[in-house]
Amino acid sequence: MAEIKVLALDLDGTLTNSQKEVTPRTRAALDAAIAKGVTIVLASGRPTAGVLPLAKELGLDKKGGCILSYNGGKIIDCRTGETLYQKQLEAQYVPELCAFAAAQNVTIITYNKEGVVTEHPDDKWALRECFTCKLPMTGVDDLAKYVDYPICKMLITLDPARRDEVWAAGKKQFDGRIDLYPSSPFFIEAVPLGVAKDGSLAALLEHMGLGRENLMACGDGLNDRSMIAYAGVGVAMQNAEEPVKAVADYVTAADNDHDGVAEAVEKFILK
């Protein structure tokens, strides 16, 4: 097996436990991996600002590392803040996505420099995004008119019972123009066509002069499936959705509440 030089980690349901914390064992495993020269990439659907606090908590702003945000829409260098990769959602799709969400009677959000923006600031799933990312909420009257600046993604929030139904309708309406896929039972991501974690990681590896055989990726959600299939070592958490486990090279015995990431890092990097 080729030496692992890059470790891509999904956050929610993978790196963090149910309390959105990184446990001491997992933190120690990551510190040991960094000491061996491994570059940590925090790979999330969250906006960049929603990943920065965790990156700082792990010391990546000083030790080095990257943030892959918006499900692959942007990658930054944690130490310098430099943008290494970015793809933005074409402005023409913002009003159509807002209209689609209204027709489906679900909430849609996006982000500004400060935090989360939506027409439905009391929506419990939108508030969950604020809590998870530690970002403030801004309520607006007309989201389509408000968004007059470049964005990397929009996010549909909805009751889990409706996720697959709304996802199917969205894929049909936007087929071949933008990509929609679930990142949790209550979130559907709307991103530029072709944006996914695997593609942006491929660009990062090329930038670093490395290949996919040097990448290990850990995740649990459907939006992690592409990077797990792409990586030289693809790891699905015990709590991962079944289609994710199906493409993984390894499924952890432990879930995200019991140091599943530490288990994988110890097995494949610190062995």
Regions found by a protein language model. Give the residues of each.
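Asp-based phosphoryl-transfer active-site loop
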Residues: 3-19
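Short, hinge-like loop/turn segments at secondary-structure boundaries
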Residues: 57-61, 85-86, 125-129, 197-198, ...
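Conserved acidic, metal-coordinating active-site core of Asp-based
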Residues: 100, 104-218, 222-224
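Short, structured coil segments at secondary-structure junctions
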Residues: 58, 63, 71, 174-176, ...
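Mg2+-dependent phosphoryl-transfer enzymes with acidic/Ser/Thr/Gly-rich catalytic loops
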Residues: 2-6, 23, 189-271
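Short active-site oxyanion
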Residues: 37-41, 63-65, 153, 213-214, ...
